[in-house]
Amino acid sequence: MREGALGVGSSLIYTPANFAETDELIALVGAATEYNGRYISHLRSEANKLEEAVLELIKISSITGAPAEIYHLKAAGKKNWYKLENVFNLIETAKASGLRISANMYTYAAAATGLDATMPPWSQEGGHDEWVKRLKSKKNRDLLSEEMLNADSDWENFFMQAGPEGILLTGFKNPDLKKYIGKTLSEVSNLRGTSPQITAMDLVIEDNSRFDAVFFLMSEENVLKQIKKPWISFGSDAGAIANEGVFIEKGAHPRAYGNFARVLGKYSRDEKAISLTEAIRRMTSLPASNAGIYDRGQLKKDYYADIVVFDPEEIADRATFEKPHQYAVGVEHVFVNGIQVLNHGKHTGALPGMVVRGPGWSGWDTE
């Protein structure tokens, strides 16, 4: 924390973080609060045990006193869509009691992660090499196939939440597998003549990676419900990538290019789901304050001049799941720390970015 961290983050559906128990997280977050740190979590479940996972986050916040945020709030899997209203009630009750609970979201009904999310944690214990080794064992493959088909598993089973037809393969390292980019796991399974479970295992082995995929898990109705909640900020859950060079050799989730323009265009201007003023607040000052960053996110004296100039009548996302590598349109100028980096839609070549440090930063004096 003295070196500038904003707080403690956890990704509790992934190994090795999913082996962490609540008491361990409380101890870590408690230490961060000594430096005004926050807690942010990719919940232990976004599906079958969503409500329990939200209660765990609320408990951690209650015991430690730390503000807590949920990474990309969602109810994953059709049978869990109804749970979103329950989650709203849990969070809003906690907020009313004085806890500082918030969440962020991206405005698409599909998630993106690796194929490790389709297999149980025990198969991945010990790291990647051990995982691949287990996938080559006939005994393990039979057991994994059975567990992957269990819709009521006690782990976050994206294989069943999305279904093979709802898992879009978007990125491989192995050149021989790139022909499958843009196809669903179901389609590749049919092409290869193996079950979807075995196909997933074989692709992990052949690519020697967790490789990327898009999972169609959520409902558009729930996306709209979340957009209307004033305590949910907007975030892409993606890196900033370019539509050129090595970046276009693999697929992507369209949120990497279009999330913010989609809020301003589709949901604010076109569908009137949120006012323009509120949309801007929830992608600027709200996330900045939630993260404990108090000199950014507003056009205000003594704040860093991070400014976007866009045409509200033209701004729109262009990226799709079929053709994700497309920039949004309608953004004319961008200033970062007062330096122009986009001029009439063209990059100036300037690189004025700065490291943003948390409230506990001691100027590197960590003795």
How does the language model describe each region?
Residues V356-E367:
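Short, solvent-exposed cationic patches
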Residues M1-A17, L25, V29, K59-S62, ...:
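Active-site neighborhoods of metal-dependent hydrolases
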Residues G4, H42, N104, G193, ...:
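Divalent metal-coordination and catalytic microenvironments
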Residues S137, K225-I232, S236-D237, V308-M354:
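C-terminal cap of metal-dependent C-N hydrolases
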